[in-house]
């Protein structure tokens, strides 16, 4: 009798232990009523400046960032249907690194919708590298207008996260 009870308890524990392994998130499928309002497939030979702005500066952006964001095609360019953003170790305007910071602010904004992007980041141990895909509020100034971090890949530590700042 004791063996039977112990067997039932162990079996139940094992089954309950497997529950977290069952996927609980279903991929959102587009409703037939949804319509595409904007996309950029980067299929030209340059960045579409009617939609994108290369933000420039080396002020740290409130995050103590060490790079200078340039508008140079060395740091951001379109090739083979993809947008490439390249960080470089180089002295530039009192900074030791350069990169690109691109935004659609003032050119594209959305109140509701599904946002989607294909993003590939380089591998390796790269301290300080922080690729991200964000959405910022249209009205007011940050941080009062909110921020939706769809993807942040901090320091390439096998971590991809998202966050809502409100």
Name every feature range the model reports, one short phrase each.
Residues 1-10:
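Bacterial N-terminal signal peptides that target proteins for export
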Residues 1-2, 27, 118:
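Generic N-terminal leader/processing signal
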Residues 5, 23, 66-69:
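Generic alpha-helix initiation/capping and coil-helix boundary signal
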Residues 10, 14-18:
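Hydrophobic core
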Residues 18-32:
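Sec-dependent signal peptide cleavage junction
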Residues 31-166:
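GH16 jelly-roll
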């Amino acid at each position: 009798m004791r063996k039977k009870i112990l067997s039932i308890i162990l079996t139940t524990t094992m089954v309950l232990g497997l529950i977290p392994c069952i996927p609980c998130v279903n991929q959102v499928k587009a409703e037939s009523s949804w319509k595409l309002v904007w996309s950029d497939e980067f299929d030209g030979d340059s960045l579409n400046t009617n939609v994108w702005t290369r933000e420039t500066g080396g002020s740290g952006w409130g995050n103590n960032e060490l790079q200078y964001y340039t508008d140079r095609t060395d740091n951001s360019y379109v090739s083979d249907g993809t947008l490439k953003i390249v960080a470089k170790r180089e002295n530039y305007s009192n900074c030791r690194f350069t990169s690109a910071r691109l935004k659609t602010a003032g050119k594209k904004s959305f109140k509701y919708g599904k946002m989607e992007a294909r993003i590939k980041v380089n591998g390796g141990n790269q301290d300080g590298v922080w690729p991200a895909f964000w959405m910022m509020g249209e009205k007011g100034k940050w941080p009062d207008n909110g921020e939706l971090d769809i993807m942040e890949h901090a320091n390439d530590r096998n971590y991809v996260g998202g966050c809502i700042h409100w």
